């Protein structure tokens, strides 16, 4: 990438809209816009002060034809998104005007921006670190208010500041180690070793606290793949419709009605769920239904959360028990439906298999128990880990991997101190931990990883 050239891209989503925006960033931004913009006073933009919006027209310099009526804003660096000069052209929405203006900007000397290049320049120019850059993408793709809040907190530097504090502790440890190595002819005194050991254990705790939020953070960021399973006609489709609050699945008294997979995205108490209603699991000779059953089993194995539906009005069968046995080691919730009918289901064998799983009795037709289901789902996600109110969550798999490597290294360092191994060994472990943490903020990350991260951004951001 050439950081000294000027880039341009459409910054708004494609399609019809009230406004479309073409963004330009670089040292020649004002020079390029002067070639194609004329204000109502027949002035070029460089004649106006920075940080104001100017009304006028984009003019094709070859034909002198008006391309569109626009509002243009000019922001002089370094106090801009990229820390470079930025020009934004607000034109009429729709593909034709924004496409024509972008083509004109490129024709007079700008280069088409790569995906995420504006944000990448903000990172390379030191306005934000890598964790903050990734938070911008999370803000755009947030599925819930909680996801948005966590991403905004990360953009404001909550994670970066915490990581920086831990790295400072590691640097302090390195300084003590290097001083001791410089005076290697003297034995390292117990006071110095005690100090290093206490610091090392403190860093372990700091990193572990961050890692403890990672499972919840991943769910907040990416959503929870939730599969509803059970025999045919137990109420799986009714549950999907009740949670979505509209009729998405066909509900009949005929077993095997749902033959395909029905998927809905919804937000339950701040948790983004990808809720999947599957074909009823049973032995069948129907070819189409059989395919649906096989797909149900595949999704069952891949799901983050399983909701098992049972019918309170029917006796427990071997088929039910086989399904229950499958969830023994999974995050799962058991729902007993049709409690408004005569009860025939014996819960004792179920409770013996899944002693730690929550069982909720509901009547979906009477709309009884739905709130309890939603509360149970939220409790299962947040149980034992980060709470919904927490803003500092590790949501990114890349960050989690870096933290795990940092923790492994400092644990090795702690062991080396306890065993009174040569301090050169301790130094290597501390440095490895420090470097791993630096990957989160981009201080010690490889260039190809940076390129990969920004390729996932949209063009114009």
Swiss-Prot record:
Cofactor note: Binds 1 potassium ion per subunit.
Subcellular location(s) per record: Cytoplasm
Any one of the GO BP annotations: tRNA wobble uridine modification
Binding of (6S)-5-formyl-5,6,7,8-tetrahydrofolate, residues: 23, 88, 127, 461
PANTHER family to which the protein is assigned, alphabetical: TRNA MODIFICATION GTPASE GTPBP3, TRNA MODIFICATION GTPASE GTPBP3, MITOCHONDRIAL
Annotated function: Exhibits a very high intrinsic GTPase hydrolysis rate. Involved in the addition of a carboxymethylaminomethyl (cmnm) group at the wobble position (U34) of certain tRNAs, forming tRNA-cmnm(5)s(2)U34.
Family listed: Belongs to the TRAFAC class TrmE-Era-EngA-EngB-Septin-like GTPase superfamily. TrmE GTPase family.
The protein, known as: tRNA modification GTPase MnmE
